[in-house]
Amino acid sequence: MDLTPLTQALDQHRTVEVIGNSGAGLTTLAAQAHNEWPGAAVVQQDATAHVSYLRDTVIEEVALGLEQRGTPIPEMRRRCERVLSAAGLTELAERHPAQLSGGQTRRLAIAAVAVLEPELLLLDAPFAGLDPTSATHIIRLLEA
């Protein structure tokens, strides 16, 4: 798959939306783009695949990648609070991830990747099946 049009669009814009019908190859495009850009991160449509459930709280789940990278605690706290706020998850920060609804889990999965500040963030159908409030929170998170 030729990624030249995507590369050109990303050179000109901060956000690019690629839309198409089911089976059009968008998931394949996301996987290939992830391989082409080392600083890219992908959140697949099944958000539960991105949540480890090994952490006791939502904020610990968001902090996991930062911990693994050795991010200093004050910086980790600042970044986690910022993405949780943008994702509308601040009030759920101390809740266990398994207690979240589907939309909340999707927001958690995106927040846990966005907090790492990847060079390129690829979201596979980020709004599929979401209520308007959850979709708005994801938009805010992506703009943060």
Q: Which stretches of residues belong to each language-model region?
A:
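Short loop immediately C-terminal to the Walker-B catalytic DE motif
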Residues: F127-A128
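Conserved ABC ATPase "signature" region
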Residues: P74-L92
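Hydrophobic anchor residue at the start of the ABC signature
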Residues: I110
